[in-house]
A protein has these predicted regions:
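Non-ligating segments of multi-cofactor redox enzymes
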Residues: 1-198
Length: 198
């Protein structure tokens, strides 16, 4: 990124947050970017300590062979420079290389099966199979843990939350785009909001 582009982004971001008022500006700087289909890499510690633990080295981004991990820019306040996966664009293929290179323990070493980035949630009002439009098994076929994390009951996909890794392969493959980039199956980052036990 060129200096001019950086300063433009910085200026527009600071200007927008200051115009919104001091309370909104403060909230924007500390609001987690982890939301529906926006996930931390595998093995990430809970969000409330992630920004303090991650040193923003970018090793996870460099090592990812699928280029699914990106670093957040300055518009994300205290989370700038931390890694994020946009599951509907490029999902996590669970190669686990990012976990191996993390020097701080922000990404804890877990197996593929133990990974919990989030949980897939099927929107039964928009899923082709659930509304009876056609027989679609795309999410089932793409799941690396089919018949464990996702099963077919009466040919309809059902998520087993205890086995779902939240990798986003189902979301990425889903042919239905609803609104604001959401699909008929989306990943909710439930584990990122877990409270740290001291």
């Amino acid at each position: 990124m060129k200096r001019r582009s950086f300063l433009k982004i910085l200026g527009s971001t600071l200007g927008a947050t200051l115009l919104a008022g001091p309370e909104q500006a403060r909230a924007a700087l500390f609001t987690s970017p982890v939301t529906t289909n926006r996930l931390r890499p595998p093995g990430a510690v809970p969000e409330e300590i992630f920004a303090g633990k991650c040193i923003r080295c970018g090793r996870c981004v460099e090592i990812c062979p699928y280029h699914c991990i990106t670093l957040l820019d300055i518009r994300h306040g205290v989370f700038a420079g931390t890694p994020l996966i946009a599951a509907e664009k490029i999902p996590c293929y669970l190669c686990m290389k990012c976990v191996d290179v993390c020097p701080t323990g922000s990404l804890i070493r877990v197996t593929q099966e133990e990974t919990r980035m989030g949980v897939a949630i099927i929107d039964r009002f928009n899923c082709f199979t659930w509304v009876g439009m056609t027989l679609c098994r795309t999410c089932y076929d793409k799941c690396p843990f089919k018949d464990k994390a996702i099963v077919l009951e009466e040919l309809k996909p059902i998520i087993n939350e205890s086995a779902c890794t939240g990798c986003g392969l189902c979301t990425h493959a889903c042919p239905v785009t609803v609104k604001e980039g959401k699909k008929a199956v989306n990943i909710e980052p439930l584990y990122a909001t877990a409270k740290v036990k001291y």
